[in-house]
Structure formats: structure tokens, C-alpha cells
């Protein structure tokens, strides 16, 4: 499973979305058609779970029963494309979500109310990422989050919305549309917090810290950095075990004194045992830290 899919599947298991989220989804992955002298709405995705989620959003908000259709792509990947198809009440949905203008070429940006309200903005960003977002796997060490828009003004509004949350968002125009993107790891982690993907944020941070620890070891090519590398190397097993605990039973399942040591070890892989001991809220001895780290390793080994 890609990291993008992991984030999206976490998002759809959060509490039910709202109209701002649905508006973003429709604007970024929806299209209108005319059949039997009435409008129909099609929302496409390559993820079956997201299709079911969109289905539920529409059904719950408008007491309308959409239809889910699918077809097979003809390219080499042969992915299925799922379409949430709405025949009834389309005009009501468009009017309620203030989307009609965007489909008829009069307005393609983001509603001012969404740009001015924090909660509405968070919901809109969540929907935008579900519909057209992607994150490069943090294991690659090259950090990038992108959201594709058909229209440049929408991409620019999206960047403005992200900037409101203190994110260094930028846009770039392509022949087929425009992309709003983030390239700083800290901005990507903050974005994940904003849209509610807390578990994936923790995973992203753990991978980033582990990569940085490995890079520190690789750069340890002189006497001064060799000592740091030795400390980091000794902590790698513990860091991997802490990540194992986070991914299985969760760090919160540990006693508070073990949680504190675990958080410090992951956050500061280059710290010596003494530095970890000194950094605790209530400092303890080196032997006390070693004792807690051994407990953490044993818990991970028993999983």
C-alpha cells in the first residue's frame, strides 16, 4: 500500500465529513453530464473505499441514493476506475454546495467562506486531498505533497488556504491543469495534522527521523562525528522497536515512564544515554534510562 493510500484510508475512517469536504471532492474529481434533459453528476476515483465513502456522504446529506459504477482502464496498470453516479437532485446538491458556477465556467476558485473559516478550511483540504492529493513515500527522502486542480485559480486559492495555516504552499501550472504543492517535511506533517491524519503523521515523522539517523551515521567520517555515530548505531535497535510498538499496540499502551523515554529516543537518536536522562521532565540516572530502554526492547521482542 502506498503512503498516499494509507493517508486516504485513515481519513475516510474519521468521523463523517461535511459539505465543505464534499464540495472539494466534487470540484476536484466531479463532472456534469446531460441525460434525458436533466443533469447527472459523476465523481471518479481509483479507490473503491473512497467511492463508498463519497456514496455515503451524498446519501447522508441529501437522502439521495447514488450508484457506484466501475470500468477497467486499458493501460498497462489496468486499474479499475470507480464512478459515483448521481441522477436525481443534482441541481439541489450544486446549489447547496455553491458549485453551479464553477461547472458553468463562471467561478472556479474556492468560496470566500471556506478561505475565512478555519474549520471549513480544514474540511475542504481533507476533501481536496481525498479527491486529488498525493504524497511521495517518505522512505524516498524526497518530500513532496501535491494536489492537482483543473484550474489555476483554484490551485492558487488552495495555496492561499494552506498558507493561512502557516504552510509554505506553492503552485505550478501544467498543460492539463495546475498543482498546489508542499516540499518541506515539516509542512507535510503539519498538513496531515490539519486534515486529521494523525497516525500517518506519526509514521511520516518516525520514518523521517530514522532516515536522518541513518544519514548521520553515513556522515560520521571523523573523530568527532564517529562518537555520535556510535551512539546513534546503538540506539537504532531501540528506535526500530519503538516504531514496531507504535505500529502494533501503540505507544500509549506503555507506562508513562516508558513513553517519555521512547519519545525522547525517537526524537533525538543522537542523544547519549546521559543526555536522554537529563532531558526527562524528572531527570534520572543513566542506569535508570538503560533499564527503561531494556524494558521497551523486551516489550517489542514479545510482540
From Swiss-Prot:
Give GO BP annotations, semicolon-separated. cell division; regulation of sporulation
Q: Where is the signal peptide?
A: none
Top-level lineage group: Bacteria
Coiled coil location:
none
Q: Does the keyword Cell division apply?
A: yes
UniProt keyword terms in alphabetical order: Cell cycle, Cell division, DNA-binding
**DNA-binding residues (ranges):** 272-303
Pfam families for this protein:
HTH_WhiA, LAGLIDADG_WhiA, WhiA_N
Q: Show the GO MF annotations.
A: DNA binding
**Family, similarity comment:** Belongs to the WhiA family.
Q: Which NCBIfam families match?
A: DNA_bind_WhiA
Q: Which HAMAP family match?
A: HTH_type_WhiA
Q: Summarize the protein's role.
A: Involved in cell division and chromosome segregation.
Q: What is this protein called?
A: Probable cell division protein WhiA
Gene that produces this protein: whiA
